[in-house]
Structures are given as C-alpha cells and as structure tokens.
Amino acid sequence: MSAIVDIFAREILDSRGNPTVECDVLLESGVMGRAAVPSGASTGQKEALELRDGDKSRYSGKGVLKAVEHVNNQIAQALIGIDASEQSYIDQIMIELDGTENKGNLGANATLAVSMAVARAAAEDAGLPLYRYLGGAGPMSLPVPMMNVINGGEHANNSLNIQEFMIMPVGAKSFREALRCGAEIFHALKKLCDSKGFPTTVGDEGGFAPNLNSHKEALQLMVEATEAAGYKAGEDVLFALDCASSEFYKDGKYHLEAEGRSYTNAEFAEYLESLVNEFPIISIEDGMDENDWEGWKLLTEKLGGKVQLVGDDLFVTNPKILAEGIEKGVANALLVKVNQIGTLSETLKAVDLAKRNRYASVMSHRSGETEDSTIADLAVATNCMQIKTGSLSRSDRMAKYNQLLRIEEELAEAADYPGKAAFYQLGK
C-alpha cells in the first residue's frame, strides 16, 4: 500500500446551503481520496459532536472553519506518514487525539471526513472499488431502499409530526427494478397531489410535504399512488415510517398536532399498532423517545415480532449504547449514520455487533447531504440489505441511488437483491 503524504480539508456547502467539511487525502503513490460529511436536522442527544464555529457573522454561526483547521493541523500532523491501509489504527489515533467520548474536541465532522477520505484513497491505491475494499471478495447484496416520499416533522413545514413516510419496493427482482418502481410511485404521487390541490414542493430529503389532516391521510395517499403506478401495496411495496418521536415528546407524553392528541407511551404504542394493522407498514424508526426505554420495551413487546423497529436517536450508531439496547431487548434494528459516531471503524463495529445479535442494519443518509456517495458503497460492503437515502428527487439523494446502480452493474450475476428477506430478524 502507500503512506499518507498530505491531508487537506475545506469548507463546502451541503444540500441545505449550510457549511460542512470536505477532506482530500493524498498518498505517496499519487492517488487521492476525497470525502464530504453530512449533517442532520433531528439529532440524537448522544450523537458525536458536530463542531460548528458559532460565529454569527458567518453562516449564522454554522461555519466549520474550526473543524477544517483541526484536520489541516492536529490530525494531519498525527497521520502523515502512516499507511492508508491501516484504517482502524488511523481512526484510533484520531479518537485518542480527540480524547472525549463524543469527539467534542476535534469534532466528528473533522474525524469522519478524514476517516472516509483515507478509505477512499486506500481503495483507489489498491485498485478496488470502495465496496470491495471494505467488504472483501464474498457475495454481496444490494440494499432494499427506503424511499422517503412524504416528509413531515423537522424535514418539512407542515402539520405532520411523523417525519418520514417511505416506500420499500420489496417485490422487485433487482435494485434497478426497485429504483424504477420507486420513481414511478413518486411521479404518481406528484400527480395525485396535484389533482387534490396539494402543493408539490419537496422537503429536505426530496419527498413531498403536503399539509394533510392526519398521518392516516398520508398513508392512504401512498396506497393510492402505489396502485396508480401499477403496483400492489402490501405485496410489491411495503411502507416504512420514521416517527422521530423525540421531536414531539414532552413532559412524558407524545404530542401529535396532526391528530390533536397527546399519548402516554403505552397509548402511542397502541396508536402505532393501529397504523400497522390498517396499512402495510414493515418498519418503524424511532417509535419512542430516545430516553423512553420503558416505551421502547412496550413497543418491542407489542410489535417486535412482525415489524422492524429501528433505533436511530436511540442508538446513535454507538456500539456501547447498542449493546445496552440488545441487553434490554429493545428494538430489533440499527440505523447506521456515519456522522453519529465519527469514524468508519466505529461504524463497522456497530454494524457487526448488530449482525451478531440478529439486529438488522439500515445504512442511512442525513437530511443535510452532499454529492458524496460513500454510504452506497458501505451498504453493499456490509451486506446490511437496507438503505435509507431519501426520495426520488434532488441530486444529493440520487447520487447514492445512481452509485448503487453502478455497483449492481459491476457485480452482475453476483449481485443479490434480497426483497423481503432483508427483514430476516422478524419472526425469530
């Protein structure tokens, strides 16, 4: 392999027009790896720290020049001369250099930019695509996409508290076919919204953001759009929700403005069960507040045998917190967001821990994205079989889908599309 000879970071803009960190890693062989870091809107309390400048005179305080400086100085000095193939060692050096539990000194946006750029440089130097470099030579699955077609919560300016309403083309025979299915439903939904007088502006993740009267109305729209596109809801396509419940949990209750009601955790679990019974919902993310472990236990006991229950804010891609959740028997799947933990090595450790305990993993973007498509390669490399990367619009979302098309093409007959088998943890 080849040693690192230069590391350089810069401030660029993400899909929301906010600054983020991009990093270039140059090796002595002459190859370069480049990576850019995403940013979330609804964030878990225990996520690794995204370092912002706080200078209100620049980007309303959201600048990342401090993180860039950390990359170009402390991190570069510590890593130059090390072989780029030593990913775990490099990540551990940055963890120790930071010295905090949450990357609070250097910033997770600094460490992650370097970590991903190192992997890209090493893959390029080895003459391998990133998914092969990280995943090895074994069989690989393309992920079933969770396509966010209706946005609510923190991702849209409407009355829906549930943040994401997603379609999953489980009946497709290939990723290419799944992407076509999703695109056709997305365009059918646009026509449907037009016909009902709903605006067809899109939210942060590219889905529509109609001002509906209830969550059931959103789900019914999805059923109608699926059928209008020529597919069967419950057979060809299943639905997934991201409740982002921590955003509407206050004083021990779940407050749904769209429904005009507040619920205890037991009542909210029943409410979610009623949606599952009425609509073909296979996956619910953050169905309870991140600190409501009792609520999570109730929800898991009620729905965990038939519905994928995904911990995002609950686990924040942190192996230690995931281990606690596994021990307590809450949820049955992990949402994987690389910037929640701040290095590739820790991300891969979390996915491995989930697999060993029969928890599914869902590779995920953030609402503030860039054209970086690393998570597409990661989804294939880890065989996690599911990816959540937004709707069928906005080039920051399509970059990931298009990369998966390329990977499927490269793998040819070796590419597997799991469909419903992606939910292997259910009915155990």
From Swiss-Prot:
Q: Which GO terms describe its biological process?
A: glycolytic process
State the compartments where it is located.
Cytoplasm; Secreted; Cell surface
Enzyme class comes to lyase
List the molecular function annotations (GO) for this entry. Answer: magnesium ion binding; phosphopyruvate hydratase activity
Free-text comment on the cofactor: Binds a second Mg(2+) ion via substrate during catalysis.
Which residues hold Mg(2+)? 242, 285, 312
**Function as written in the Swiss-Prot or TrEMBL entry:** Catalyzes the reversible conversion of 2-phosphoglycerate (2-PG) into phosphoenolpyruvate (PEP). It is essential for the degradation of carbohydrates via glycolysis.
Q: Which pathway?
A: Carbohydrate degradation; glycolysis; pyruvate from D-glyceraldehyde 3-phosphate: step 4/5
InterPro entries listed in its UniProt record: Enolase (IPR000941), Enolase-like_C_sf (IPR036849), Enolase-like_N (IPR029017), Enolase_C (IPR020810), Enolase_CS (IPR020809), Enolase_N (IPR020811)
The family classification in the record reads: Belongs to the enolase family.
Entry's EC annotation: 4.2.1.11
Q: Does the keyword Zinc apply?
A: no
The Swiss-Prot or TrEMBL record lists the needed cofactor(s) as:
Mg(2+)
Keyword annotations: Cytoplasm, Glycolysis, Lyase, Magnesium, Metal-binding, Secreted
Active site per the UniProt annotation: 205 (proton donor), 337 (proton acceptor)
The protein's name: Enolase
Task: Give the UniProt entry's GO cellular component terms.
Answer: cell surface; extracellular region; phosphopyruvate hydratase complex
Detail which positions bind (2R)-2-phosphoglycerate: 163, 337, 366-367, 388
Task: Look up keyword Secreted and say if it applies.
Answer: yes
Q: Which reaction is this enzyme known to catalyze?
A: (2R)-2-phosphoglycerate = phosphoenolpyruvate + H2O
